Amino acid sequence: MKFTALAKATLALGILTTGTLTTEVHSGHAKQNQKSVNKHDKEALYRYYTGKTMEMKNISALKHGKNNLRFKFRGIKIQVLLPGNDKSKFQQRSYEGLDVFFVQEKRDKHDIFYTVGGVIQNNKTSGVVSAPILNISKEKGEDAFVKGYPYYIKKEKITLKELDYKLRKHLIEKYGLYKTISKDGRVKISLKDGSFYNLDLRSKLKFKYMGEVIESKQIKDIEVNLK
């Protein structure tokens, strides 16, 4: 399946990749429609980031077309779309020893399960590899707070897809993100070389970033600002 087709398929989850609404109706209707869209968007984000995931280890996969990998996992047929830089990283016909962080995007009539990115070479170490400080703040309202504690990562390398997913799931479970707390907010993942990643909590991580790989020991800290 081509990238565009898979992207269209995910629209069934709701307006998941944008928090904006373009409208030319009168202001009263516009406000009502915006509220409705935001509520639907928030519920879709909650469903996505609390859905079923699988951490598939030591996978053997075959290249399928220009930008896909295919393999079987416990009898399930899996197809991984390779976004962004992954297209150039995976040029061989076959691969051994891959780890895949699976989040289902689609299931077709042939019982093939589709996911995007989340592929790295098999991690060889076990236990905690990195523990950057996770600073979380909510600055406004009666429930304002500031907290900081180590965030344990048990992989030498981790995709931005997996880190984004697990951070949001942590925020959902511990702080009510997308439930009692607004979906507005940002996450900044700072690396020791001065570079960083910004995540917008109002929208799902874009497909093109789901293949980004981060050396976990190079993560300096993670800042979360909730609104």
UniProtKB/Swiss-Prot annotation:
InterPro entries for the chain: Enterotoxin, SSL_OB, Staph/Strept_toxin_CS, Staph_exotoxin, SuperAg_toxin_C, Superantigen_bac, Toxin_b-grasp_Staph/Strep
Primary location: secreted
One Pfam assignment: SSL_OB
Q: Which UniProt keywords apply?
A: Secreted, Signal, Virulence
Q: What Gene Ontology cellular component terms go with this record?
A: extracellular region
| Cleaved signal peptide residues | 1-30
Subcellular location(s) per record: Secreted
Q: Which family does it belong to?
A: Belongs to the staphylococcal/streptococcal toxin family.
The record's annotation in NCBIfam families points to: PRK13038.1
The task this protein performs is described as: Plays a role in the inhibition of host complement activation via the classical pathway by interacting with the Fc region of human IgG and thereby interfering with the IgG/C1q interaction. Also inhibits the penultimate step of plasma clotting by interacting with prothrombin/F2 and coagulation factor X/F12. Does not affect the protease activity of thrombin but interferes with the conversion of prothrombin to thrombin. Interacts with human receptor CXCR4 and specifically inhibits CXCL12-induced calcium mobilization and cell migration.
| Binding partners and assembly | Interacts with prothrombin/F2 and coagulation factor X/F12. Interacts with human CXCR4.
Listed name of the protein: Staphylococcal superantigen-like 10
Tell me which species this is from. Answer: Staphylococcus aureus (strain NCTC 8325 / PS 47)
Q: What is this protein's gene name?
A: ssl10
